[in-house]
UniProtKB/Swiss-Prot annotation:
Note: Originally the subunits of the type I platelet-activating factor (PAF) acetylhydrolase was named alpha (PAFAH1B1), beta (PAFAH1B2) and gamma (PAFAH1B3). Now these subunits have been renamed beta (PAFAH1B1), alpha2 (PAFAH1B2) and alpha1 (PAFAH1B3) respectively.
Family matches, as SUPFAM superfamilies: SGNH hydrolase
Name of the molecule in the record: Platelet-activating factor acetylhydrolase IB subunit alpha2
Coiled coil: none
Expression sites (tissue/organ): Ubiquitous.
Length: 229
């Protein structure tokens, strides 16, 4: 799979300020400040699927107690997340687990390029935060009825199932969650706009995610051993 300069989805790039209010950069700068002020055990980074998670009670129930930071920005692609992580959002912190959820907004890229962009994010995290265990959340199906974007996201997930096991400290969490019913439709009770999750939709994702995070946190006893010794 193409990486680096040959893959546009793997080239870090700040989001364009199309609307003219510079909100994207303001959010990034706030995240960089959070890195200086807080000590997260768990870091979430990605697009609106990450960002909106903190608006629901399940975030406060499952993830706030884990000292989690939410670095999600709506509309972000793999390129934007790469840029943010290269420019301060991995500095001054030492999280034990990093959750990555991005790729559904990479409309200009092929499935192969999107998967390569996600792999580039994992490789960057491994370089900057080698102690962290990484969880990549698979891309969700989207659209009320079957459509090409669903097929593309499914292909990204298939590619990641093959490629991520070759990288260190990372695992893919399947987020299918039974969102697509037997008739091929997605319910608005799970995704209110057939893309973004409702509270009930997030519950299907967050409960298994929380279980995996807890498992990984329990598997990082090395620091405790060194402090006890």
């Amino acid at each position: 799979m193409s990486q680096g300069d040959s893959n546009p989805a793997a080239i870090p790039h700040a989001a364009e300020d199309i609307q003219g209010d510079d909100r994207w950069m303001s959010q990034h700068n706030r995240f960089v400040l959070d890195c200086k002020d807080k000590e997260p055990d768990v870091l979430f980074v990605g697009d609106s699927m990450v960002q909106l998670m903190q608006q629901y009670e399940i975030w406060r129930e499952l993830f706030s107690p884990l000292h989690a930071l939410n670095f999600g920005i709506g509309g972000d692609t793999t390129r934007h997340v790469l840029w943010r992580l290269k420019n301060g959002e991995l500095e001054n912190i030492k999280p034990k687990v990093i959750v990555v959820w991005v790729g559904t907004n990479n409309h200009e890229n092929t499935a192969e390029e999107v998967a390569g962009g996600i792999e580039a994010i994992v490789q960057l995290i491994n370089t900057r935060q080698p102690q962290a265990k990484i969880i990549v959340l698979g891309l969700l199906p989207r659209g009320e009825k079957p459509n090409p974007l669903r097929q593309k996201n499914a292909k990204v997930n298939q590619l990641l199932k093959v490629s991520l096991p070759k990288l260190a400290n990372v695992q893919l969490l399947d987020t299918d969650g039974g969102f697509v019913h037997s008739d091929g439709a997605i319910s608005c009770h799970d995704m209110f706009d057939f893309l973004h999750l409702t509270g009930g939709g997030y519950a299907k994702i967050c409960k298994p995610l929380h279980e995996l995070i807890m498992q990984l946190l329990e598997e990082t006893p090395e620091e405790k051993q060194t402090t006890i010794a």
